[in-house]
C-alpha cells in the first residue's frame, strides 16, 4: 500500500510512475482517490466544527439551567448537531471504504533504476555465471529422466490429484529432501538466517498484508473457514510481525523458511505444462528480511547473492536479470530474477525472484520499527526471495548432471545428504 500523503502531495508523479506498470491498473483512480481524500478531509473539518459548536452549546445549556432559564432551543440545536455529526461520520465511513478499496489495488511505485519495458522480453540481463553444458550425446528432459529412473511419477500424481501434481519416489524423494536440507543448512549456517517452519494455511488478513489479496485471489487455493493455502512462505513469515513495532537494533531480521507452496496457476494454461517447472504444489525455501529503509537496497543485494551462491556451489549455470517496469508485478519496487539454465528448454528458466517491497507490504500489514524508545514509529522495509525453488532445482540437476547411460551424477554438495555419487 502506498503512502496516502505521498499520493495527495504528488498525484501526477504517482500517475507517471505507474504508467506502463504492467498491471491491469487504471491510473485515473488516482484522481478519484485524491478527490475522495479531499472530500473526506472537508467532512472531518466540518465534524470538528460541529463538535466545537456542540461543546460550546453544552456550556451555555449548563449556565442556563443553573440560572433557571429555559434551554429548550439550545437542546434542540444540540440534538440537530449530534444528528448531523452522525450523518457525516457515516459518510466518512463510506468514503473510507471506497478509499481502502482503491488503495489495496494500487501497485507499488517502481524504483528509479527499474528499466522501462512492457514484458519479460525487455528484462535486462546484468550478469551470467557458468557456461551451459555442451552435450556429446542426445540429452533428455528432466521429466523423461525422472520417469526412466523411477524418481518421478507424473501419471499417478495426475490420477490421485489431477494435472500438475507429482509423486517423488525413492531416490527422487531423497534428492528433493537433500536439496531442501542443503538450502536450509547453507542459509542458516553460512549466511546467518534464522530457520522458520511456518503454518501452511493463513487467513485473509495475512494474504492481504503481503499483497496476494485482493488482486490475486483467483491464483490462491481457498479452503473452508476463511483460510488460504500459502502460495509462498513469504505470506506467513512476513505476517509474523503484523501490527507490531520492532526495535531498530534487532534489524535486519533474516529468516529462511521451508514450506510447501500451493498455486492454482490461473492464466498459465499451456505454459511449461510438462515436468516440475509449473506445479500446483511445490517445495521452496524462502528468504525473508525486515530492514531499515536506508539499508534495504544493500540487503537486497546480499539476499540475491545468497540465492546465487546456492547455484554456484551446485555448479549450475545461471543468469540474473533486472525486471522491467511492465513485468515487475504488483508488490515489488525492484526485482531481480535468477534464471537457471535448462537444456531441455534451450533457455534460462526462473528459479528465484528477489524483491525489495520498500514499505509497501509494511503499510498493508502495519509493521513498524522504532529507532529509539522515544522516536516515532516508522514503517520497515520488507524483502524476500526464493532461496531456491526446490522442484526447479531438482529439474536443473537432473538435466545438467545427466549421463549418456541415463544415470545422473550427484552434485558434490549433495553427496553427504544422499549418500550416493550417482543416481541410476
Swiss-Prot record:
It is found in: Cytoplasm. Its EC number is 6.1.1.11. GO terms for cellular component: cytoplasm. InterPro entries: aa-tRNA-synt_IIb, aa-tRNA-synth_II, aa-tRNA-synth_II/BPL/LPL, Ser-tRNA-ligase_type_1, Ser-tRNA-synth_1_N, SerRS_1_N_sf, SerRS_core, tRNA-bd_arm. Keywords: Aminoacyl-tRNA synthetase, ATP-binding, Cytoplasm, Ligase, Nucleotide-binding, Protein biosynthesis. Its main location: cytoplasm. It holds the Pfam family tRNA-synt_2b. ATP binds at residues 263-265, 350-353. Catalyzes the attachment of serine to tRNA(Ser). Is also able to aminoacylate tRNA(Sec) with serine, to form the misacylated tRNA L-seryl-tRNA(Sec), which will be further converted into selenocysteinyl-tRNA(Sec). Homodimer. The tRNA molecule binds across the dimer. This is Serine--tRNA ligase 1. It comes from Clostridium acetobutylicum (strain ATCC 824 / DSM 792 / JCM 1419 / IAM 19013 / LMG 5710 / NBRC 13948 / NRRL B-527 / VKM B-1787 / 2291 / W). The gene is serS1.
Amino acid at each position: 500500500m502506498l503512502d496516502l500523503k505521498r499520493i495527495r502531495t504528488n498525484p501526477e508523479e504517482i500517475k507517471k510512475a505507474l504508467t506502463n506498470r504492467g498491471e491491469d491498473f487504471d491510473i485515473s483512480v488516482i484522481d478519484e482517490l485524491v478527490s475522495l481524500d479531499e472530500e473526506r478531509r472537508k467532512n472531518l473539518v466540518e465534524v470538528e466544527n460541529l463538535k466545537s459548536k456542540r461543546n460550546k452549546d453544552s456550556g451555555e445549556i449548563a449556565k442556563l439551567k443553573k440560572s433557571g432559564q429555559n434551554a429548550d432551543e439550545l437542546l434542540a440545536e444540540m440534538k440537530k448537531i449530534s444528528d448531523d455529526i452522525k450523518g457525516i461520520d457515516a459518510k466518512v465511513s463510506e468514503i473510507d471504504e471506497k478509499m481502502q478499496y482503491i488503495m489495496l489495488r494500487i501497485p507499488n511505485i517502481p524504483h528509479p533504476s527499474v528499466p522501462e519495458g512492457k514484458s519479460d522480453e525487455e528484462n535486462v540481463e546484468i550478469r551470467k555465471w557458468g557456461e551451459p553444458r555442451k552435450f556429446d550425446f542426445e540429452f533428455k528432459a528432466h521429466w523423461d529422466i525422472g520417469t526412466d529412473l523411477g524418481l518421478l511419477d507424473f501419471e499417478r500424481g495426475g490420477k490421485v490429484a489431477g494435472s500438475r501434481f507429482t509423486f517423488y519416489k525413492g531416490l527422487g524423494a531423497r534428492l528433493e529432501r537433500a536439496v531442501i536440507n542443503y538450502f536450509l543448512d547453507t542459509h542458516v549456517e553460512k549466511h546467518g538466517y534464522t530457520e522458520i517452519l511456518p503454518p501452511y494455511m493463513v487467513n485473509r488478513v495475512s494474504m492481504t498484508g503481503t499483497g496476494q489479496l485482493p488482486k490475486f485471489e483467483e491464483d490462491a487455493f481457498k479452503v473452508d473457514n476463511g483460510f488460504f493455502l500459502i502460495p509462498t512462505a513469504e505470506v506467513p513469515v512476513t505476517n509474523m510481525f503484523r501490527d507490531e513495532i520492532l526495535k531498530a537494533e534487532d534489524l535486519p531480521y533474516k529468516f529462511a523458511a521451508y514450506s510447501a507452496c500451493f498455486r492454482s496457476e490461473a492464466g498459465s494454461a499451456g505454459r511449461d505444462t510438462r515436468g516440475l517447472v509449473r506445479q500446483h504444489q511445490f517445495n521452496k525455501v524462502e528468504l525473508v528480511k525486515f530492514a531499515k529503509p536506508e539499508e534495504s537496497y544493500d540487503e537486497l543485494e546480499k539476499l540475491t547473492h545468497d540465492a546465487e551462491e546456492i547455484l554456484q556451489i551446485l555448479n549450475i549455470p545461471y543468469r540474473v536479470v533486472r525486471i522491467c517496469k511492465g513485468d515487475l508485478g504488483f508488490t515489488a519496487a525492484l526485482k531481480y530474477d535468477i534464471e537457471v539454465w535448462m537444456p531441455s528448454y534451450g533457455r534460462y528458466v526462473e528459479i528465484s525472484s528477489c524483491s525489495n517491497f520498500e514499505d509497501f507490504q509494511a503499510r498493508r500489514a502495519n509493521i513498524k520499527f522504532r529507532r529509539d524508545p522515544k522516536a516515532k514509529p516508522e514503517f520497515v522495509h520488507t524483502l524476500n526471495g526464493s532461496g531456491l525453488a526446490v522442484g526447479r532445482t531438482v529439474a536443473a540437476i537432473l538435466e545438467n548432471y545427466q549421463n549418456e547411460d541415463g544415470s545422473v551424477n550427484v552434485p558434490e554438495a549433495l553427496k553427504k545428504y544422499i549418500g550416493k555419487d550417482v543416481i541410476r
